[in-house]
Swiss-Prot record:
GO terms for biological process: translation. One of its GO terms (cellular component) is cytosolic large ribosomal subunit. The keyword Ribosomal protein applies. Pfam families: Ribosomal_L3 (PF00297). InterPro entries: Ribosomal_uL3, Ribosomal_uL3_bac/org-type, Ribosomal_uL3_CS, Transl_B-barrel_sf. GO terms for molecular function: rRNA binding; structural constituent of ribosome. It comes from Clostridium tetani (strain Massachusetts / E88). This is Large ribosomal subunit protein uL3.
Amino acid sequence: MKKAIIGRKLGMTQIFDENNRVVPVTVVEAGPCTVVQKKSVEKDGYEAIQVGYGEIREKLVNKPLKGHFEKAGVGLSRMLREFKLENVSEYQVGQEIKVDIFEAGEKIDVTGTSKGKGYQGIIKRWNAHRGPMSHGSKFHRAVGSMGAASYPARTFKNKRMAGHMGNVKSTVLNLEVVKTIPEKNLILIKGGIPGPNKGYVIIRNSIKA
């Protein structure tokens, strides 16, 4: 059964498992999320729930969005996301989705926005080899060949070059839930997940598990 929740990355730490081995974990504050809208096949052409997460000041929300929340009879949320689930009928507008929908040992996929690195060269961005660093060499960290000469007389699309790195949507598959702490809305995930601390993430049960 598909399930999903929105959360906020708090940072990384390490805990000991039952065999006293150190396990690196990422701590995520997941939920509580509020169901703001239900989409149906008859009205929208597909089934999904729209979920809100995070507090936001009223003056930062525009009038159309404020009306959307008022119509649902729920509080304002910083983030709105849609999830296509198989059991949409089991959810009601205003219902809260909490971290206890996941259990320890479960496999999940985590989607977030990777850390932005700004403008980076080809070595850092694409892991290219650098040139000789010895005296007399005039080629150190440059791109090198960008393609052929008079034919085709152009550089092909997708040629690896320097440019903006990071700050893109990224998903890590098949991570393991180590522990959930429902009273604090925390979920401990084995390993690292995309994005900086305080970055928003979406946690779904794994599509490959």
